[in-house]
From Swiss-Prot:
Its EC number is 3.1.1.61, 3.5.1.44. Gene3D superfamilies: 3.40.50.2300, Methylesterase CheB, C-terminal domain (3.40.50.180). It comes from Xanthomonas campestris pv. campestris (strain ATCC 33913 / DSM 3586 / NCPPB 528 / LMG 568 / P 25). This is Protein-glutamate methylesterase/protein-glutamine glutaminase 1. CDD domains: CheB_Rec (cd16432), REC_CheB-like (cd17541). Phosphorylated by CheA. Phosphorylation of the N-terminal regulatory domain activates the methylesterase activity. PANTHER family: PROTEIN-GLUTAMATE METHYLESTERASE/PROTEIN-GLUTAMINE GLUTAMINASE, PROTEIN-GLUTAMATE METHYLESTERASE_PROTEIN-GLUTAMINE GLUTAMINASE.
């Protein structure tokens, strides 16, 4: 597919209304061609073979074959960029996170009532995510698992430095977007239980944050949770903003605390990575380490630069292992990243850089 060739999209959804609305929204963009639609995965299988789409939009819950089963088969037999269409419910959030773990690139939230008007309100986001998915590397999701890291396995530790982290010694700040739910899982899965505190921002709908925190907690030796306002930031813990709010850190004497911020979107995002990173630059400075993982757009790039200028070591995920090298690429081009690291080595480098941070 060249830049001049429209992105060929197949819509798979059991709702005729959703199929029609997505077709209308996507067809308005000259860079997209809707080549077909299917009411269930079994019909979709035949159309995929015949139409060879660049991107598939896939409803999670459908008759005849579960959307997750179909997705798993698709990614194993014919890897294709998939954008999930999911409901804004707790059950829908958990199912969508499972879909992302199986290889879906991104998702679009479907309103529970007045679906037609609701989807129209997301038209710009739908078009943007479909175009982004066409450029995504779905093969990057088949990554080998890295060994778990312990503090005595760090690469190049500072001679004589005690690898024990007190409350305010070190802080790791991470930002991610498209592809980030799985990238964050990989990173946290390989962090030791006594790692420095981690503060994170991942672009997600408000109703997804609780399920995401619970999912990460199941996969990590660290304690992963949604942050509460004023909560002390402790080693061995990782904090995410609660749904639809920014996360910042503040200094309180010899420790840091979480500050939940209900201010306006930044870079069109709420939560925004730049909000977190700028607070870390101002309040933790050289005691922090910053990282940007896979994601679309440029949120976090300027904040990471501010962290670097404040004395914090910084890194970004490399292009080869990123689903979308938007945010990491923007930070790299801005000169905000000291290192470019494959996903399977991010946890290792964060621990090593934490030991070296001043």
């Amino acid at each position: 597919m060249t830049l001049e060739t429209p992105v060929r999209v197949l819509i798979v959804d059991d709702s005729a209304v959703v199929r029609q609305m997505l077709t209308e929204i996507l067809s308005r963009d000259p860079g997209i061609e809707v080549v077909g639609s299917a009411a269930d995965p079994l019909l979709a299988r035949e159309k995929i073979k015949r139409l060879n789409p660049d991107v598939i939009t896939l409803d999670v819950e459908m008759p005849r074959m579960d959307g997750l089963v179909f997705l798993e088969n698709l990614m194993r037999l014919r890897p294709t960029p998939v954008v999930m269409i999911s409901s804004l419910t707790e059950r829908g959030a958990d199912t969508t996170l499972q879909a992302l773990s199986l290889g879906a690139v991104d998702f679009i939230s479907k309103p529970k009532i007045d679906v037609a008007r609701g989807l129209e309100g997301y038209a710009e986001e739908i078009v943007s995510k479909v175009k982004m998915a066409a450029k995504a590397k779905v093969s990057a999701l088949n990554r080998p698992s890295a060994p778990k890291i312990t503090l005595d396995m760090q690469s190049a530790p500072v001679p004589g430095s005690a690898l024990r982290f007190r409350t305010t010694d070190r802080l790791i700040a991470i930002g991610a977007s498209a592809g980030g739910t799985e990238a964050l899982r990989v990173v946290l899965e390989h962090m030791p239980a006594d790692a420095p505190a981690v503060v994170m921002t991942q672009h997600l709908p408000a109703s997804f944050s609780t399920a995401f925190a619970e999912r990460l907690n199941r996969h990590s030796a660290m304690s992963v949770r949604e942050a509460s306002d004023g909560e002390a930031i402790l080693p061995g813990h990782a904090y995410l903003p609660p749904g639809g709010q920014h996360l910042r850190i503040i200094r309180d004497g010899a420790r840091w605390r979480c500050r939940i911020d209900d201010g306006p979107p930044v870079n069109r995002h709420k939560p925004a990575v730049d909000v977190l990173f700028r607070s870390v630059a101002a309040n933790a400075g050289p005691n922090a380490v910053g990282a940007i993982l896979t994601g679309m757009g440029d949120d976090g790039a300027r904040g990471l630069l501010e962290m670097l200028q404040a004395g914090a070591p910084t890194l970004v995920q490399d292009e080869a292992s990123s689903v979308v090298w938007g945010m990491p690429g923007a930070a790299y081009k801005l000169g905000a990243a000291q290192e470019v690291v494959p996903l399977e080595r991010v946890a290792e480098r964060l621990i090593a850089l934490s030991a070296q941070a001043r």
